[in-house]
Amino acid sequence: MKKILQLIKQRSITRKLLVSFLSILIIPVVILAIFAYQSASSSLDRQMMGSALENVQQLNEIINTSIGEKENSADYFSEWLTKEKYNAKSNASIAEKFSQYISINKDVESIYTSDTKGHFTRYPDLPMPSGYNPVERDWYKKAVANKGKVVITDPYKTASTNTMVVTIAQQTKDGSGVIAINMTIENLLKTTKKVNIGTQGYAFIMTKDKKVVAHPNEQSGTELKGDWLDKMLSADKGDFQYTMDGDKKKMAFDTNKLTGWKIGGTMYLDEIHEAAQPVLHLALIVLAAAIIIGIIVMTLIIRSITTPLKQLVGSSKRISEGDLTETIDIRSKDELGELGKSFNNMASSLRSLIHAIQDSVDNVAASSEELTASAAQTSKATEHITLAIEQFSNGNEKQNENIETAAEHIYQMNDGLTNMAQASEVITDSSVQSTEIASEGGKLVHQTVGQMNVIDKSVKEAEQVVRGLETKSKDITNILRVINGIADQTNLLALNAAIEAARAGEYGRGFSVVAEEVRKLAVQSADSAKEIEGLIIEIVKEINTSLGMFQSVNQEVQTGLDITDKTEMSFKRISEMTNQIAGELQNMSATVQQLSASSEEVSGASEHIASISKESSAHIQDIAASAEEQLASMEEISSSAETLSSMAEELRDMTKRFKIE
């Protein structure tokens, strides 16, 4: 990497741009091509593995369907076959049942049974090899050993027809024999051979003992070999990659639960790579086209950059040789065009600068001569300044003595003002306290006025209530007078009634008694009314007495209100006068404080003037020394002016090498 960077650094800008553009163009396209190829390969891999799994599952379902039907049939016959049927004189009923079953199930090669004594019945009835004993056969032994459970044998060739079959066997329910069904695997072989995974991939079925059940390239019953078989037998289902006969393959497998057979679907990895090749070829074509188009575009871009740069390099060389009349013509509107304009502006600025330098050189030469003459005049003026400073220093010392005397008098005046300010502050504080006390008294009087008003209002309300009682009492008196009149009339009526009753004789006696009772009640009512009237008269007298007292209280309350109003006004005037006095005292205190502060400022200013005067004396002495130093400096300036004049001549000679017109 370091070598590549060093090579780029040593090359021209054209090659640097070319390498940079090609890197930016090629690297992303190459990465995109690789990614597209890998993505296509992964997608094809998933599709083919999905197809393999689907085919494996279909074969598994076919096995379940075929074997499941035969298991159901075996279970049916194991219950139908009994010891009585085996011991019958003829097995015609068994043969007829088997014939019906064979006619319905075309994938059954034969169905047969044997009891424990070896009596064998089969349909179709084909000749068996000599010495054939069904009780010694594996299918019989396995069925008896599993006691009523269905057993499935590995594929084998029958002794009678040499056909590859699978036997499904089961012991009868009463244990008197075994029923067995030979199912051909021809349909399973055809279905397996029809399965295509990709173009070369295939499916197969094998037993747990690695023997072929169905395989497009191997005979049924053949034992398969290879390390990859252990991966299939170590798990119920899954997928893995393996190598067989130098070919890289990938397999998906599953296990049939009824038989324990392994069902596998294998595909060649080369097919995935071959299927993904068109994607890679297309990516390479796109890469080549992109590179060609990119080179054309890059060439135009690089030329648009390098051509103005070459013009700038040539013009820069001529300017470095002193030719400031050089200009550059770049018409592009990009950064290079701006650079060309800036370059021309720089050349113009340099020309102006050289003009200015030449003018300045002439001015410097003339100024140096004037400076030499001015230095001589300044030296003479400095001598006069030195004499004047000495005279000023003597007068300044007398002024310092006068300032110190004035400062002492100001200090004494400042002490008096300070004492006056403190006294005025004490008086002001006392006035403020008086104002606060007067204000509190005014508030108390105001509260008293409010309370007196409340009392006045209550007295007036009570007076109104008593007057109402007087009116009601008079009304009651009038009512009692009416009652007395009624009682008198009732008494008179009772007398008249008694007289009339006496006249009536015996008939009016009862009425006479009633009239007497009425008269008595009238007399009692009149007496009670008189007593009530007497009480009412006394109440009216008491009410009149209360009214007189209320009027007296009301007058006293009014007198108290007038007095409290006058007192409140007096407190207000006291408070206002006290506030006015406090304000005046505060103004006086502020004035005294201002005078005190002003005297302090004057005192400070006097001290400051004295110190400045002393400093001025010291500075005057320093100025005198500086004046002497200035005389020496003027001599150095005169020498420097001569040197500056010679340097201006040298600078004029240097600017002559530049061509500006």
From Swiss-Prot:
Q: Where does this protein come from, organism-wise?
A: Bacillus subtilis (strain 168)
**Entry-annotated residues carrying Glutamate methyl ester (Glu):** E370, E629, E636
Please tell me where this protein is predominantly located. Answer: membrane
Residues bearing PTM Deamidated glutamine:
Q593, Q594
- PROSITE patterns assigned: CHEMOTAXIS_TRANSDUC_2, HAMP
**Function of the protein:** Chemotactic-signal transducers respond to changes in the concentration of attractants and repellents in the environment, transduce a signal from the outside to the inside of the cell, and facilitate sensory adaptation through the variation of the level of methylation. All amino acids serve as attractants in B.subtilis, they appear to cause an increase in the turnover methyl groups, leading to methylation of an unidentified acceptor, while repellents have been shown to cause a decrease in methyl group turnover. The methyl groups are added by a methyltransferase and removed by a methylesterase.
Protein name, entry field:
Methyl-accepting chemotaxis protein McpA
Q: Where in the cell is it found?
A: Cell membrane; Membrane raft
Assigned protein family: Belongs to the methyl-accepting chemotaxis (MCP) protein family.
Gene it is expressed from: mcpA
Which residues lie toward the Cytoplasmic compartment? 1-16, 303-661
